[in-house]
Amino acid sequence: MKLHEYQGKEVLRDFGVNVQDGKVATTPEEVQAIYKEYGQPVVVKAQVHVGGRGKAGGVKYSANEDKALENAKNILGMDIKGLTVNKVLVTKAVDIDAGTEYYVGMIVDRNVQSYTLMASAEGGMEIEEVAATNPEKIIRHRVDPVTGLRPYEAREVAIKAGFRGNLNKIADMMVKMSKAALERDAVLVEINPLFVDADGTPIALDTKFEIDDNAMYRHKDLAHYRELSAEHPLEVEASDYGFAYVKLDDGNVGVLGNGAGIVMTTLDVVNRAGAKPANFLDIGGGAKADVVYNAVKLVSKDPDVKAIFINIFGGITRADEVAKGVIRALDEGILTKPVRMRIAGTAEDEAKALLNEKNSDLIKMYPTMFEAANEAAKEANALGGK
């Protein structure tokens, strides 16, 4: 479960992290009232569960009351990557030039089968950009989930990352952040920027906090944070179906497979083919025709999807059940986008016979996933994909 910035700050504050105060508003008039209360320049920040809010115009500095009101009117109700902004966080503006911005974060790192603490002196930037252009500027440190991050480890990481200021206070914030991540079963926690003021005091100006959905039964006190209206509607619908589904930004090829490993590999081959996957969708093992039908229906609803790549290796999943689900979606007029399939394994021959008998121009099968990915990418790009 993703938390809004203000919610993530509330969780971190409970663990003793020094976070920037702010107030939530749902109307321009409320923003105006908050500005009057603060009596100084503010920043109006869209609260949506996607990255790139600033680039999309969802974060605005407001030097005066009129500007705060204008920015609130522009941001509230705007669409950011398919999500409508229904609320904003209003914070006091900080003079960034009077201090230094850093980045710290904790992720579940499957490569080391543990948590990894990340720190960088390149704060205020998207960490993905830093990882792509200057990966050496990100310091990584494995955190033992039993002992947690110890103060001396945090200080060592801060020094290696080139942090300046009161290193004991910075290390203390990192320790408290890691404790929040561990105790709240987070898969991701970020403080970006971690602002160190002229006195060397660290302040969390912006945060990301995401809790493992499978652990939410342990955190029922946070269940009220979930807002279906703030989540992507396709992800909400997928949850109703019981699918493992993630909407991906800027994609043009819908991806459907059986098993997380196959789906992850499929994302890679789509990228290699010159397109971008629009989603992650795992139908699971043993999926029947109705499950496949619902999965195809879900992916077809995404306007970003220009072509669909179905990658199936049948074990307990029968390929003919997959074919029946696809054919049903076609017969009902739900499937209107090109489908490129690689289908193999249990009942492969039966599946191919069903699809060949249907003889639809929309559906084509290929012997390898690389060929299918290349054809799906060609179709998507030719049809105006991103």
UniProtKB/Swiss-Prot annotation:
Single Gene Ontology BP annotation: tricarboxylic acid cycle
Cofactor section: Mg(2+)
Reaction catalysis annotation: succinate + ATP + CoA = succinyl-CoA + ADP + phosphate; GTP + succinate + CoA = succinyl-CoA + GDP + phosphate
Protein's pathway: Carbohydrate metabolism; tricarboxylic acid cycle; succinate from succinyl-CoA (ligase route): step 1/1
EC id: 6.2.1.5
InterPro entries assigned: ATP-grasp, ATP-grasp_succ-CoA_synth-type, ATP_grasp_subdomain_1, Succ-CoA_synthase_bsu_CS, SUCC_ACL_C, Succ_CoA_ligase-like_bsu, Succinyl-CoA_synth-like
Sample GO molecular function, one term: succinate-CoA ligase (ADP-forming) activity
ATP-grasp domain ranges (all copies): 9-237
Cofactor detail note: Binds 1 Mg(2+) ion per subunit.
Protein name: Succinate--CoA ligase [ADP-forming] subunit beta
Gene: sucC
